[in-house]
């Protein structure tokens, strides 16, 4: 951990020195399993002043285990507990056989501002063509929302810049 913190802080400071408007993304937390939480609980306070965006990865393991919100709820709670206020991005979303729409909706509802899908050519467990189609339709319909409000376990409202609202049951 000490080496990570030292390298991260020095690198971030150097990048900001050379490119003042650079956006520094926290090194990707690969899930929030107990050992990950322990590491980040200790490391985050030591690097918090040297990154702009917190991020998390959700890579579905071979057995296909899915997290309900791509670990966003866990990283969000940890950031709050540590009094760190940063936007959250999912920078490697590989959902494999998980239910695509509930995972994306729950990730956004729990604080993700950006979700970057690994794409169809990434190694590992692939999303089905049917799920990929659903995701593309979801993006087309709900992209550029400014707020998401959870109405129930399976219903949300997306609020857009122009004030319009779209509901989604999933």
Give the location of each predicted region:
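Aromatic- and carboxylate-lined catalytic core of secreted/periplasmic carbohydrate-active enzymes
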Residues: 97-170
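Noncatalytic carbohydrate-binding groove/subsite architecture in carbohydrate-active enzymes
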Residues: 2-101, 110
């Amino acid at each position: 951990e000490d080496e990570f913190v030292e390298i991260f802080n020095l690198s971030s400071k150097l990048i900001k020195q050379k490119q003042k408007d650079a956006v520094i993304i926290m090194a990707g937390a690969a899930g929030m399993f107990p050992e990950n939480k322990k590491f980040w609980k200790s490391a985050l306070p030591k690097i918090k002043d040297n990154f702009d965006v917190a991020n998390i990865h959700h890579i579905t393991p071979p057995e296909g285990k899915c997290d309900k919100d791509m670990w966003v709820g866990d990283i969000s709670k940890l950031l709050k507990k540590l009094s760190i206020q940063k936007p959250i991005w999912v920078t490697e979303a590989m959902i494999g056989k998980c239910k695509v729409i509930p995972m994306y909706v729950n990730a956004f509802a729990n604080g993700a501002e950006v979700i970057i899908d690994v794409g169809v050519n990434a190694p590992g467990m692939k999303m089905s063509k049917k799920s990929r189609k659903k995701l593309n339709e979801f993006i087309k319909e709900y992209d550029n929302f400014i707020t998401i409000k959870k109405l129930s376990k399976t219903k949300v409202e997306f609020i857009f810049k122009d004030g319009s609202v779209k509901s989604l049951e999933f």
